[in-house]
Amino acid sequence: MHGSLRLLVLLCWGATLATLATATVLEKSLGTPYIQTSIYGAWWFTGLWVLCALLSAFYIMRSQLYRRLAFILHVAFAVILLGAFTTRLTALHGEMHLAEGNPTNTFTSGAQSHTLPYTITLTRFEVTYYLGTTAPADFIAHVVIADPELASDSGTVSMNRILSRRGYRFYQHGIDEDLRGCTLLVAHDPWGIAITYCGYGLLLLGMLLFMGTDKGFRERIQLFAKRPTILAIPLLIALVGAVGITRASNPSHRASPAAPVANHSLLEAPPASQQALAVSASTAPPKTLPREVAAQFGTLYVYYADRICPLQTVAYQFSLKLTGGFGYRGLTPEQILMGWIFFPSSWIDAPLIALPRGRVRQLFASKNGMVSWREFSDSSYQYRLALPLEQIRRGEYPGNPQGVLAADEKYHLIQSVTSLRLLGIYPLPHNHDSTAIRWYSPVDRLPEALAGQERIFIRKGFDYLAELAVKGDYAALSAAVAKIRQYQQRNATKVLPPAYRTRAERLYNQLARPRPFAFASLSIGLLLFALLTASLAGFLPSQPLWITRIALGLAIVLLAVISGIIALRWVASAHIPLTNGADTMLFMGWLSLLIAILRHRRFTPLLPIGFLSAGFALLVAALGSANPPITQLMPVLSSPLLSAHVACIMLAYTLLSFISLNSTMAILLRCLNRNTKTAIEHLSDASRTILYPALFLLAVGIFIGAIWANVSWGSYWSWDPKETWALITLMVYAAGVHTHSIPRLSRPMPFHIYMLAAFACVLITYFGVNYLLGGMHSYAG
């Protein structure tokens, strides 16, 4: 009976995992609304969870497992499920549109309309912007509540700032184009949220009690660390990052949103460039400015990607987008950009445009994937991508259209540079407000009231610069650049970023190259991994101490370099860099090296495993984006919960990657020499020790993310593919600590094999969802 009950529990949980995984895959093809209704919203899905909970509770009681400290953790999960079930039964979600000055007391949920017990009136709506830009920092609705049962009150609703009244919670959701109205999300779920949050609190309490009082866990943790202080380091970073995010998200001015800086028409060229775009058959290397002069242009400020940054940043992004790297024929990114601006005829035949792999290369008959700008026109002077783009528009393109779209983007990016529309370097006050600045390019439509001399300076300035560049009068050219910089300082001194931030960004542009560090880390890790495996298998003597010391020194150097890159990006962006895939992978590499350095003496394989884990993380960061652009934080990301959520999740993934590499070593030892039982058991003990904090951190990261989602969107769980796979990962790895229920996993080799297979869940959670399945957490877009 006991064995049958255990099998039934395992089958039930297995069916739940299979359902969740299948739903995320089907969502990609069938769409989110269908999956939300047919699976997540179906009563059989709710019943499956209830059945799992009841069977598990019955099994725990029959096995008398309630006498253990871990019982608190199981009760916490039961309370969380009860909260979710309560939300399923009683919660109400909808939308309310507010128009300025019009009292409203109704909101809609689907096709149904619901009445509030009070009236809300929007008195004023405003958008705050990051200083000197048109990038929104927050959307704020000022409202007055007229309640017949309570005193009238006023309040505000903004991103990550909820307005609560008599069980109803209001969240900022959308704005009207005229800025005289907004849409609020309305949530009424007092019981479900309260019960779920109690479950989160009980879960945290259970974890703390388990780590502090469970004798078996404390004995295991001695293998890894005298004190688990290492786990507090990323959380401290998250706390500091939260403060940084809060400060960075405080807007410095309020204004009506200005129109975009430039209408990026890509079909025009300024007078200075029209003749230069003539056909040139020259085979000489592309002409450009000297390195020092081009670098001076890089010190100018430019309005780019909704932020004020050095022109050097634009040059690096331009070079990366075109060539896939940060140079061409020994020229710097600034020289490449200046070459296209001042000497385009010398560049149109240079094969520096990297085409994506696939069918797009066949259109150009390119073998190595590198083409010139001229090759985008065929022998009839027709745009080579015109037909494929039309096929894509009609949905008739035979294959993945991303390659064609990427190539088209590169072509038009060059046009935007040669037409000077990308160069918004001239700041002008907007509406007589010294902090409301618009940045103009030489070809933008300038304000009618602009004085004649200043208008000529902006409109004809680059013609003069082009003339000096062609003449080779670099002294005069440098002086002209200095005048533009003085103009920027005079007109935009209150909104320009601090000098230290600009210096940090310029240095970051030059140093942020994760690819060579990734290969170095992987090479060192593979060498150490092979030496240690051979030593444990008996093929080599014990690893000499000097090898460990050299490896430790290299790890410290690599950690210092990565720390510097992260610090520079943090300073340049004014918020903790944990908001995209490359950032989180860089952080994971940093964590891997930090843990390996601090605890390698207590666990010998930790150093090679740390190098390998860091190397893979850095390689993914390099493949994703060698130098991800620095951007302003989206308003919804300006929450102190974000950094804590990401830090916990990434630390958990780092520890789980350690376990997978540990298991890899154990399996190799088993294959190479069957007389390695002691070493395999030692690796198993280490993995079990690491597994507990990894699971706890993953669980904490998930429920911090749920709280953040509830604060931002009014729903603490929405079955987004990323959060669903994070839950799957937690459930799969949790089996590794339930050796009483799954006795086979108490044996070292089955445990190692299971842990290695379980790591596929981490890979799917991060890479599969981010780049394939999509969702709110996806970086695929």
Model-derived regions, located:
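Solvent-exposed, non-transmembrane regions of integral membrane proteins
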Residues: M1-G781
